[in-house]
Amino acid sequence: MLEHLSIQCADVAASAAFYDWVLVPLGGVRVLDIGSVIGYGVPPNPDFWLGPCTTGEGFRESHIAFAAPDRLAVRAFFDIAVASGAERLHAPRVWPEYHANNFGAFARDPDGNNVEAVCHAPE
């Protein structure tokens, strides 16, 4: 039920380089660049935003889950993330504790956030 999500990045360019690639298998692309803020989504609607850090309170990890159309897209997301140097958190697999078709993979983005691609469709 999210309309949009925005995260603050220590290095917007590094985060943009990461998300430019990992969102492709999920159908997401860079939609808008407005100064130092970048919006991603399925055109024409940006629903995931990157911007520079505006608070000096230190890092707080976010968990961001992106919907994947199928399990192949989850695997591609993970492979691209790891190839870009992201820390592997959890390789693609079924997470039966949520439900029988919850297939997800997790990696850490350049700012340390836990990013996930998840598909709920059966194999």
Cite the ranges covered by each PLM segment.
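Short beta->alpha transition motifs characteristic of CBS
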Residues: 5, 99-100, 106, 118-123
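Short glycine-enriched loop/turn motifs at secondary-structure junctions
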Residues: 1, 57-60, 99
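N-terminal beta-strand motif that seeds the catalytic metal site of vicinal oxygen chelate
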Residues: 1-16, 64, 121-123
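Glycine-rich acetyl-CoA-binding "A-motif" of GNAT/NAT acetyltransferases
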Residues: 114
